[in-house]
Amino acid sequence: MKILMVCLGNICRSPLAHGILEAKLPEHWSVDSAGTSGWHQGERPDTRSVLEARRNGISIDHQRSRQFQVQDFENFDVIFAMDSSNYSNIVRLAPDEQSAAKVRLIMNEIYPGENRQVPDPYTGGQSGFSEVYEMLEQAINAFIERNV
């Protein structure tokens, strides 16, 4: 299974989700991350995301931001959006209904149908990154439990 994690800039939430899933992945799965905007293309994850990942025994230093592309619909089986704005932006790019059906809100993995958001911690302090990490870990654990 190939999974893509998507947030706005691909420097805060999706790199954390990418790192968490990568650390827990079954061997035959792969994961990547992207952003719906290209503002930070080629940059490393936000230092606060890197710090939060390290606190939890995960390295995300090797990741580089990239922008979501239409070709990602072909390359991935599941595309997780961090919030409804990114969800809408991704679905809008879908070439067909089958592609659009690959897009999910990640928090629906633990709160089905509630469409809860993973807040963007970019403008806040380190505690926001800790909260986001915990949310993502719970959602990813639920996804793995149902799909392995």
Give the predicted meaning of each segment:
Residues 1-75, 145-148:
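Conserved active-site segments centered on acidic
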Residues 78, 84-148:
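Phosphate-binding/catalytic loops
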Residues 23, 33, 55, 82, ...:
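Generic detector of well-ordered secondary structure
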Residues 14, 83-84:
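Helix N-cap/beta->alpha junction signal
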